[in-house]
Amino acid sequence: MKEELFKGVPIEEAYLKHNYCLDSAKHYLLNTDTWGVYELRLFARVAISMEPALLWRCLTIAIKKSQRFAKIPGNEDILYNTFETVFSVFAVFDEANYAEKTFHLWRDHVYEKEHIEQAIFMPFFEGWTHLLKQNKAKAADLMQQTLDQLERLGMKNTFSMYQSLSTFVLNEDFPGILLSDPLLSEGTRYGWEEP
């Protein structure tokens, strides 16, 4: 999926307009036996085109089929990036239940593997789930926990990015998805770019 599909077009309009273009990719993902880098990247790129139930189904398939792949050093972060993308797609379409289920799967995976870098971001995304359930005060408190940790660690760029993201999310002004993809430029956010 090319960035131009979404550039300057509201994400929901782009979804309706271009959803059918990705049917063959969805079919491939549902029918492949093993998932590696290619499949996880493809899944993240086409996630926006999937209906919520299909997106959830593909996420559970991705987790199961990428277990061997994730044991190779350096590859586990691709699965974490996939969680982030899928979560943000559910959030964009106000699918609070699916977003919360995705968050719990993601968090369980992070804590089981004791992935400290990902653990720092868990309060932020837990806060986002609370916002989807209309609890803005709890959302702001949880997001602030992540911001405080980033600030204490001296991670200025990441702090700045997540501070901007929290502002957009809490103001319900976040019309994009989170997608870390080296082919589209690292940290691309469709429909949203840092000021």
Residue ranges and their predicted role:
Residues 1-4, 13, 50, 93-97, ...:
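Short helix-adjacent coil turns
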